């Protein structure tokens, strides 16, 4: 595989959110659907005994929050996916801000009941400043939530970005039925609650006008879905990928990460529209990813954070070229040599 082919197939993104919006749970389910794990853990749950994969530190498992960025990767449909799960709490925001310098796109998780919260606004300001493309995932639709159209208006106003829903929920709370995939023009209904494996049975309906839809979700919810999707198509412009890549438009997905609702739809669309590694600006020039010379920067260092971890681990964002094991690289400003240990 050539360097350009390797660059094109990579997708590196961060999952960011206000505390308790479901960021780490979504990360866990993306790993599940991507085949990186076979059973999804949970941040806080009495039913699920397995802890979240990204919460590897003991303090994270004890408190049920993320306090440090975790980096995970998997192969999916020919793409190399790198996920960075970030802390949501303001006390650890510096970690998240540094992580945002190393990603090519972002998924913002929003609690459907609470809407846009303070930390989400601050993180979006950083994304806007860096012109980082964002996708919004409205989470926790299995609980009573705000009206979807009210949420879309709130996202546009509070995050100051145009939105375009690419999926739409069928009710919420106790009557939540699933999500309609506007991007793929089909409906997937999940028939299980809180399944932590990726083998939940589904029903796909490609035509909303089909009477079969009434049989699955009743005539009331079927008619409501038809009206909602018609309104979406009438109010919002067609999805423009170039506008998304310019960070001018945010695709919006709805779902419930803990119940697997809407996660696969998000992942399938993400690998199609998200950017591959982008050029990196420096003080003197723009570094293109396809340049032969290896360049990069350390965006995070773990040191003495967990007794089971190595004493120091540096996280390197490669901006161009290929990193080779057991090879020394000059470190800018310090004139030191860096090598993999």
Identify the function of each model-found stretch:
Residues 1-337:
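Structural and coupling elements of P-loop NTPases
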């Amino acid at each position: 595989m050539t360097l350009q082919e390797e660059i094109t197939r990579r997708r590196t993104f961060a999952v960011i959110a206000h505390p308790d919006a479901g960021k780490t749970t979504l990360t866990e389910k993306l790993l599940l659907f991507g085949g990186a794990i076979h059973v999804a853990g949970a941040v806080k749950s009495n039913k699920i005994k397995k802890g979240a994969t990204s919460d590897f530190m003991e303090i994270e498992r004890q408190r049920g929050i993320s306090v440090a960025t975790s980096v995970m990767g998997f192969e999916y449909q020919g793409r190399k996916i790198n996920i960075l799960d970030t802390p949501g709490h303001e006390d650890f925001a510096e970690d998240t801000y540094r992580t945002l310098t190393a990603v090519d796109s972002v998924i913002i998780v929003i609690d459907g009941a609470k809407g846009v919260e303070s930390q989400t606004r601050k993180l979006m300001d950083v994304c806007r400043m860096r012109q980082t493309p964002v996708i919004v995932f409205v989470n926790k639709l299995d609980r009573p939530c705000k009206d979807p159209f009210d949420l879309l208006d709130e996202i546009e106003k509070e995050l100051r970005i145009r939105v375009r829903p690419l999926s739409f929920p069928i009710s919420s709370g106790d009557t939540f039925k699933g999500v309609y995939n506007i991007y793929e023009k089909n409906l997937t209904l999940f028939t299980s609650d809180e399944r932590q494996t990726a083998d939940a049975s589904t029903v796909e309906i490609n035509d909303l006008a089909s009477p079969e839809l009434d049989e699955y979700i009743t005539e009331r919810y079927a008619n409501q879905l038809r009206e909602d999707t018609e309104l979406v198509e009438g109010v919002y412009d067609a999805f423009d990928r170039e506008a998304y890549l310019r960070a001018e438009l945010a695709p919006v997905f709805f779902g419930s990460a803990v119940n697997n609702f809407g996660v696969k739809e998000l992942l399938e669309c993400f690998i199609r529209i998200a950017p591959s590694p982008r050029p990196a600006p420096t003080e003197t020039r723009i570094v293109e990813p396809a340049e032969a010379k290896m360049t990069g920067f350390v965006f995070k260092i773990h040191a003495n954070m967990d007794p089971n971890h190595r004493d120091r681990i540096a996280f390197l964002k490669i901006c161009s070229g290929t990193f080779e094991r057991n090879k020394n690289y000059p470190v800018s400003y310090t004139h030191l040599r860096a090598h993999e240990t």
